[in-house]
């Protein structure tokens, strides 16, 4: 019953993920948490995050930030990476995961979620 709460893969850092392989495997959308997933809590997008999103766009991914934070925090990060975003997402409720996939034009079979928390992401 609780298996759906656990990730398929654990990584030490978002920046270790082989996104080219994910694309080759048929994934087309990536939903990201922000804090402690892409940057430290409350930090703006750094050069590493900006480069990552540029690379993801080059590969062909659609991306969406999904955060329980308020809009000013999410917008501050997104101003540097320019992707879809949803703030005040009420994770782990599935409603805004579905909305993110709608924004990206993907579905649950072609979308990956990347976050740092088991029960809130």
Across the structure, where does each feature detected by a protein language model lie?
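Non-catalytic pre-domain segments flanking phosphatase-related domains
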Residues: 1-32
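Bateman/CBS regulatory modules and CBS-like beta-alpha motifs in cytosolic regions of diverse proteins
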Residues: 1-9, 69, 91-97
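Short, flexible loop segments at the rims of nucleotide/cofactor-binding pockets, characterized by
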Residues: 6-10, 39-43, 63-64, 87-91
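Amphipathic coiled-coil/heptad-repeat helices and related helical stalk/stem segments
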Residues: 15, 48-49, 93, 118
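Substrate-recognition element of Asp-dependent hydrolases with the DxDx(T/V) motif
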Residues: 30-32, 37-44, 49-78
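Short active-site oxyanion
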Residues: 60-64, 85, 109-111
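Short, structured coil segments at secondary-structure junctions
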Residues: 80-82
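Conserved Lys-Pro-Asp/Glu-containing loop-to-beta segment of HAD-superfamily phosphomonoesterases
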Residues: 94-119
């Amino acid at each position: 019953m609780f298996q759906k709460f656990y990730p398929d893969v654990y990584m030490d850092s978002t920046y270790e993920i082989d996104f080219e392989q994910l694309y080759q495997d048929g994934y087309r959308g990536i939903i990201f948490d922000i804090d402690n997933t892409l940057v430290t809590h409350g930090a703006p997008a750094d050069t590493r995050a900006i480069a990552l999103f540029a690379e993801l766009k080059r590969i062909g991914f659609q991306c969406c930030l999904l955060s329980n934070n308020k809009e000013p925090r999410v917008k501050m990060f997104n101003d540097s990476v320019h992707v879809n975003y949803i703030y005040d997402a009420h994770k782990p409720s599935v409603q805004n995961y579905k909305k993110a996939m709608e924004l990206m034009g993907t579905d649950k079979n072609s979308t990956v979620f990347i976050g740092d928390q088991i029960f809130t992401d």
